[in-house]
Amino acid sequence: MTQNGTLGFVMLCHTALHRAAETARHWAERGCPVVIHVDKRVRRKGYDGIVKALADLPNVRFSGRHACEWGTWGIVAATQEAATIMLQDFPQVRHVYLSSGSCLPLRPVAELVRYLDERPRTDFIESVTTEDVGWTIGGLNLERFTMRFPFSWRKQRRLFDTYVRLQRRVGLKRRVPAGIVPHLGSQWWCLTRQTLSAILDNPDRAEIDRYFRHVWIPDESYFQTLVRQVSDQVESRSLTLSKFDFQGKPHIFYDDHLQILRRSDCFVARKIWPHADRLYDSFLSNDPSGQAAAEPNPGKIDRLFARAVERRTKGRAGLYMQSRHPNENWENGRTAAAYSVFEGFSDLF
């Protein structure tokens, strides 16, 4: 096990725990402490399995378990508890990197450590105001901070939408706490010890947490908002490569994305298909020569993904596929009236 210890990883895991264990071991064996949170909804057998798989590593910890449903407070609570353990148990850690169980390192750990050591007081977190954000899908940029969301968007969609419309109609609004300027950004960040400690030890944290507990998708706004209060060296970008489709769902990387991932020069990527053996074998190998030192530049592959989204949503000239338009009004151009397409009748006409 190599020793550096200035970089620690917090991992939020809920599926494919065997892959999460591989990644955690990769980081831990190279001297980076790891604190793992496993979703409370994961069965005990799965949780016990990952604990046993990593039991031989002295720099791995497991935090208390929270139910982490998308869009709810549980993800923030899990991050808070795991980050607190990281700061308490590993005083040498200078940067804390938040990742998921489906993340995969793309470059040698030593390169990431060196990159952060050269920027010891810089916080890497996408953090933009609600007026400047351009990537949210479905609206609710500012309203997520001024409305209440007691219903699950995934499990109680009709109640969720109805309650949002009701609040708009009657003008119900929540008060944003004094000093809070809402910001949004990627959930996956890398913060300094000083910044993270200032957020977690804030004397007003109880009030702040009560407010954010009812913000929609708080994992994309809690740290992104509070970092602006305590840090003066924020680089508004994530060191984790992640891409999204036209619906806002994360792209999944497969084995045939190997060269694309290498071309990005990024340190970590998400989300990786758990059966992408070639990706895991390539990037978790002990060979440090697979990647040249370079500034992370996800823009190198942006055009490829933009073309994929365009093909998915607009197709190409002469191509109309029912499978590409599963919902009404998703067509590439609307006609004056309904029409039907008959296929397979060329022998008759």
Sequence positions of predicted segments:
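ER/Golgi luminal nucleotide-sugar-dependent glycosyltransferases, focusing on the catalytic module
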Residues: M1-F349
